[in-house]
Swiss-Prot record:
Induction of expression: Up-regulated during myoblast differentiation.
The protein's name: Zinc finger protein castor homolog 1
One GO term (biological process): radial glial cell differentiation
Predominant localisation class: nucleus
Encoding gene (name): Casz1
Provenance organism: Mus musculus (Mouse)
Amino acid sequence: MDLGTAESTRCTDPPAGKPPMAAKRKGGLKLNAICAKLSRQVVVEKGAEAGSQAEGSPLHPRDKERSGPESGVSRAPRSEEDKRRAVIEKWVNGEYCEDPAPTPVLGRIARDQELPPEGVYMVQPQGCSDEEDHAEEPSKDNSVLEEKESDGTASKDDSGPSTRQASGETSSLRDYAASTMTEFLGMFGYDDQNTRDELAKKISFEKPHAGSTPEVAASSMLPSSEDTLSKRARFSKYEEYIRKLKAGEQLPWPAHGSKAEDRAGKEVVGPLPSLRLPSNTAHLETKATILPLPSHSSVQMQNLVARASKYDFFIHKLKTGENLRPQNGSTYKKPSKYDLENVKYLHLFKPGEGSPDMGGAIAFKTGKVGRPSKYDVRGIQKPGPTKIPPAPSLVPTPLTNVPSAPSTPGPGPEPPASLSFNTPEYLKSTFSKTDSITTGTVSTVKNGLPTDKPAVTEDVNIYQKYIARFSGSQHCGHIHCAYQYREHYHCLDPECNYQRFTSKQDVIRHYNMHKKRDNSLQHGFMRFSPLDDCSVYYHGCHLNGKSTHYHCMQVGCNKVYTSTSDVMTHENFHKKNTQLINDGFQRFRATEDCGTADCQFYGQKTTHFHCRRPGCTFTFKNKCDIEKHKSYHIKDDAYAKDGFKKFYKYEECKYEGCMYSKATNHFHCIRAGCGFTFTSTSQMTSHKRKHERRHIRSSGALGLPASLLGAKDTEHEESSNDDLVDFSALSSKNSSLSASPTSQQSSASLAAAAAATTAEAIPSATKPPNSKMAGLLPQGLSGSIPLALALSNSGLPTTTPYFPLLPNRGSASLPVGSPGLLGSMSSGATTSATPDMPALMASRAGDSAPTAATSLSVPPASIIERISASKGLISPMMARLAAAALKPSATFDPGSGQQPTPTKFPQAQVKQEPDSAGTPGPHEASQDRSLDLTVKDPSNESNGHAVSANSSLLSSLMNKMSQGNPSLESFLSIKTEAEGSPAGEPSPFLGKAVKALVQEKLSEPWKVYLRRFGTKDFCDAQCDFLHKAHFHCVVEECGALFSTLDGAIKHANFHFRTEGGTAKGTPEASFPTSAAETKPPLAPSSLPAPPGTMVAGSSLEGPAPSPVSVPSTPTLLAWKQLASTIPQMPQIPSSVPHLPTSPLATTSLESAKPQVKPGFLQFQDNDPCLATDCKYASKFHFHCLFGNCKYVCKTSGKAESHCLDHINPSNSLVNVRDQFAYYSLQCLCPNQHCEFRMRGHYHCLRTGCYFVTNITTKLPWHIKKHEKAERRAANGFKYFTKREECGRLGCKYNQVNSHFHCIREGCQFSFLLKHQMTSHARKHMRRMLGKNFDRVPPSQGPPSLMDAETDEGMDYTGCSPGAASSESSTMDRSCSSTPVGNESTAAGNTISMPTASGAKKRFWIIEDMSPFGKRRKTASSRKMLDEGMMLEGFRRFDLYEDCKDTACQFSLKVTHYHCTRENCGYKFCGRTHMYKHAQHHDRVDNLVLDDFKRFKASLSCHFADCPFSGTSTHFHCLRCRFRCTDSTKVTAHRKHHGKQDVISAAGFCQFSSSADCAVPDCKYKLKCSHFHCTYPGCRHTVVGMSQMDSHKRKHEKQERGEPPAASPGAPVNLDGSLTLAAEQGSLLFLQTAAAGLGLLGDTGDPGPPVTASGTRDGPAAPTPAAAATTTTTTTATATATAGESSQEDDEELELPEEEAEDDDEDDDEEDDDDEDDDDDDDDEDLRTDSEESLPEAAGEAGARTPLAALGGPGPAPTAAS
């Protein structure tokens, strides 16, 4: 079938036609519009032609030339077109007859070509149709393209009508639907179907001479029935483009408009290509195309704005080769004024289809049609990057034409970048930011402009987006327009039939309609006016054709509104839903069915939320739970990245047979083949290191690639660590001394940065991980995994590294197991080994000589380099494994051209400067790694305490040196010619020292103190490790026993420290004898961040286990010399070629600019500290650089003394063994409950101290603690942690907060904050010395001691051993001594007064790189944990001890504890829970006091008829039968009792408005809450408690015999109803009523049985009048009865955040995972939102009033009868 295109014609007949025609017009439909519709008719060609053309038969060359862009389509014969056109024109003008007369028509056309334009023209200006919206080849002068007729009669300057070339021929206005033709034929009376069929026969290709009846003209446009007509699709010019391009045909896209113009005069374009309609009939729809004429003024045409069409975006995509999904198979939906294709995530289909329940025609979901809902997250979850379908904006943005620039086709929006599921961009809301539906509308107009804007030119108006203005000198281009050359307006929207306006008010009205419609789309609504038919999209709408209304376009939503305010409100609802979806939740309102039968809220008609994350079934109804649950998933993801899965006590463990399931929080290792289970996060790091060591051993720790080691039987288990991912690079906040968040780089940027300096770079983050934890890990984690140094075999996914890589590290993944590792490490290549790319060619990168990558003999020095690449992030065991492979002869000649880096000292990982252009040299390329500045090495941790990886402090310092670049050995040399010497030449000093260390590698210092026994060695018959590899300490009276080398080295280190370093040392390591020859300290501003500064700064990280630094023990002289020499680095200019300065800037060494002192980093005021949580941040202070020491201080004196303590550990330090008792298996500990009874450990011998530990490094710290306490006591104060019993009666802080006591005689002052110590001490001094005490200089009085005390108390508790004694003399040192190095300043030599506590931040020591800021358990924070003593109320059961509790899941399985308190029954593992649970009982005791009793859910309360017994944790009032599950009601009920006590004490009884007081004629009965006096013979009634007191005093005066005060006439009988006289029964009745009704709480449980006269009803709230008259005179009394809990709560509210930062002794030792959830039920009963207070009567709902809860008078308590 063809779409025939009529030639342009000119009709001289009057446009109005004959008078009878005008009478037949319907609804004001102008004949010119009808003629325009009929000017281009679609007719049916012969069946054979239609079939061949539908198949796209090839054309002859001549036909191809004539067809222009529509190649492949044949043309209809000219004569047939002329005949058909003549018939139509004659018929429209009423002149049609049986005989066709095409020739006169053609002749008339030819004769009238030179006449002025009159009659009917097919003219269209630019901007009036979507042909020119995105014209594919706009002409340079923006004029309309011309065409000549095929006979060539028209000349080039002919101004007559002509057809367009290219896209102009194929365009048919989509607004002319079949319904228009039906209306037209009906207007002419052709309603009979037979008549229409006859008309179809008259004008058809089967009868080329035309028929004899006028019906022929329209029959081809009519469907067989009205139903098919309504479902028929309409087509525009672009749909044919899309069809042709999808079919693989080529469309010529002329590059220049001028070329198209040239062709326009020579080519004649054929008819439109064939299109296949969705209808089954052979009829085609009417299509009318307005042909353009050249405009009189191209400038005026440029002022018209082209409309953007919905199809331009798709044409742009098809031109670029992209595919479009079919819509409804091979058919297309009906285009309309609502650009539904540009609406994001709507399900679209043909009109009339779909489910009405789903919101009409656009909500039906099919597999082929439409897009997923914006809420449909589950359908698009994929862990890898996915291609997101493009989502254009809701409304096409119009193109603006300016006179100076021709209109150009608007490029389609680029498809968005690939996003993974968990990126928030995927679900960004498409809701508009428009304020209102009416935004942008106009109310008044002046000359086509808004009144507030001046007219720029006459032709410019704000309506040009929708309406075009034509002046009197312009031709509008519409052939039937009767207002040619008169000022008028046309709508640019074909949907509006290019409606014409002459009134500016009509223009405003029409513009406002379009603006509101577009705004509605922006807000997600379709706007329909009364003239619009919304049934096409929303059939069955009751507002259709009645009023303006808005339909919500969201999938599944069928809301319709008539008010714009309702529209905005509904939009906010969808916005909230979208935000919830972005957060991973879905909300179901009370009227919505969540469809989840196992949901706890299913069928409850309540608003609730579901978590949408895979595998999570969590449901909740409180919004406050959203953030909590989000944090749960964040933690879960972090644990999963570390290889663990946490299960909470309230969830069932997925591991079968787990004894911790639903009992306590615990962890499972989810590595393949590992079944380790633990309860404390402190075990996580050690277990992680265990897998690490095992993996390194199996993957080639000795330098062999994994591919050369051969497969092992345990390969699956050994490689299970592939799933481990360190979380370090995801959270810079917790890498204390690393980089700031701004220095983090994505994996893509890391790969890009690495590619700049390497020959081959493969960003490994694009490869999906082969996760073995797929069942437990959330999807989408791989997208957030950073590049890192992955030590594994080549099969390890490089996106899941094990070792943490700091965010500023510049290299991409380097799989150590790959064969090309050694070459890539030495050349700086960043390769990623994958199963299909073994990275064998990686060693080619850089200019270095290739190394023997595939050889079995690997240079041992490369092992050092590989291990140092992770810098302190591997364990000492791995370091020694690598050291075992070292050969002293394996060295490189620096001058041989080979890479000098792998010599004894590995290179510093310093980023290359970006401006170092060109190919990096051998030295530069090897430096493309960044510096690691972590606080501590997690892998060097044992039992939560960081220790040095090697045996001595010399080893620690040598580690720092070993991580330096070999080009930086001038930093360590005392000679100053390093600046001029070649950077790659190692200094003689370094060569000698390192050579000595390597040669002495076997003389490890632990051999001095310990002896190793192998599996065949016999040590002792009673040794626990007999016939196993272990170590015995040979020091007298020690007897320590170790099964690992780690423990042996640590123990030897302890002995070395305690014995003053007297172990034999090797004198070969000759160090410089003086520091005077070194250059002055490097100025901070001399270099951005010199590598030398980084070498010294890297000491902050903690010792890296470099194998070359294990051996010899130093002498004291060497210590002092080395400590004073190493940090003093000569300044190296940035011009040194092989020393590129590091761009490491973000809050690191460059911006902090610390001055390196001997063993210290000094920070000036306002310098950003490297430690993000440093309590002295932005102040003048010092950080210790020795080993793992975390000491920080504010004075240079303390810094110097602390440094000396490191250099000489025996400096005024008594032997620690004199103050501790050591117990081992040979000498068992006398304490049966000691935690370390079966191991070697120490007990403190101080009186009253129960400290016990098996970690020797804690002993000096503990001594310091005692000395600190002694100094504090000398100043008159004592400190207690919140876990210590202070013993002072009435102390409100006892076991509640860490606090201080003044221990001066007669002073009971207790306080929380350390700075109060100074002010309180000054108060005592003023009392002793008088008011003038303040004038005493601080240096001469006790306040200086206080300053020293407070300042010293803020030092790190994790300071090095040996610092204890120095603290006692800090006052003298700080005032007298001069710091080492020429850095003496006044600020460094004086003691600063402590500032406000608000400026003191606690310095948490980060334990790992998790995103939760986990705090390492410093020795002080684990005080109670290490003391080994049992808290009162608990009992410990050893591993093989039967607890004889049948309900205990831990019995005979693990060491555990039982709470022995009444009605508790809590059982747990791990001592941490003991202190938390004890605090829980303290809170509960403060809550229940002596008038309530608490019962856990697991225990029976033994109260009859209690529904909570054994099911819920609940409370029972001991004064009445009230019970509740909500802890907040306990206090309220207690206040109620207090109020009732006050009422009873005043001699009154309360009755609520719902309780019958049984007093005849009481005017308050059953009306409001009131009170009756219970005094015998008194009939007084009051409504407020304020009146009770005066009435009570009157009775007291009567009892004393005083005359009553004058009163205005019988005030006693206010209601005249109380006639009790002195009867005994009356008083008994009121007292009984008071007893039965006065104790109502939350439930109103029935009290004792009452007499028949005392019926009890549920209480009601008092009336407003009664409430207004009440007062709170009993507030004080009620508060007093509330107990001490409220007082303590109020005081706790006043506590600042630093409530007890002293000594860090009060640091919470609870694990991070335990802080969120209390043990078992801890606070679930203290902070619940349950509404269960067990009301026993319906009327009891109003029992408690806010006034009663506040302590004021409430309603009289009653109980249900």
